[in-house]
Regions:
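Extracellular/periplasmic Venus flytrap/periplasmic-binding protein
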Residues: 26-28, 36-144, 181-187
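Short, solvent-exposed loop/turn and secondary-structure capping segments
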Residues: 2-4, 31-32, 78-79, 137, ...
Length: 190
């Protein structure tokens, strides 16, 4: 969409449009495909992974990480960034699995969870969203997988319900954007 907006604006001077992007966090949109006409509200994928891996630096119990992501540009980016940042910040951590699955086509994640469980992973990192995160967490609970989960979108549609229904509260950690508007009064002055 960002490419389309840029091309449209090039062809229609004086009738330019601006692409307000709420949720596409692929790094390419603010790197190699950066456009003056694109404005993103959310942090990009690298910023989110930097938050996760910076936190993981403080978690000595994390020894084995499994990466599972949706097979499209975003999921491929998450796996690449996660592997690079873990290597940089936690070289002692072993990546015991790195899996891509079809986007929004899997209805039973049990085979994927079996691989995660067999790998001995104590932590799972995923960019999954929508039904893919909900069904992934449900399958994890059904299989008794007690790993910690670090996610970009477990707080999105279906995620909180899945976490509640599966008893994984306290095991699923999610990166969210927001402004609690709790700045001190002095910061609110012009």
């Amino acid at each position: 969409l960002s490419d389309f907006v840029t091309k449209f604006n090039d062809r229609n001077p004086g009738k330019e449009v601006l692409y307000f992007n709420y949720a596409a966090v692929d790094d390419a949109l603010t790197n190699e495909k950066c456009s003056f006409w694109h404005f993103r509200w959310d942090a990009n994928s690298s910023i989110k992974m930097a938050a996760i891996t910076t936190y993981l630096k403080t978690q000595p119990d994390v020894k084995k990480v499994y990466l599972i992501n949706q097979d499209y540009s975003f999921g491929q980016g998450v796996r690449k960034i996660a592997a690079a940042m873990l290597k940089e910040k936690r070289p002692d951590v072993q990546i015991v699995g790195d899996e891509l699955h079809p986007l929004l086509k899997i209805t039973d994640f049990a085979p994927y969870i079996a691989k995660i469980k067999a790998s001995g992973a104590d932590t799972v990192i995923t960019g999954n969203w929508g039904q893919d995160i909900a069904l992934l967490l449900k399958a994890a609970a059904d299989a008794g997988l007690q790993a910690n989960w670090f996610s970009y979108y477990a707080g999105g549609a279906g995620g909180p319900t899945a976490i509640k229904q599966t008893g994984l509260a306290g095991k699923v950690h999610d990166i969210v954007e927001g402004d609690p508007n709790t700045a001190p009064e002095a910061a609110q002055k012009e």
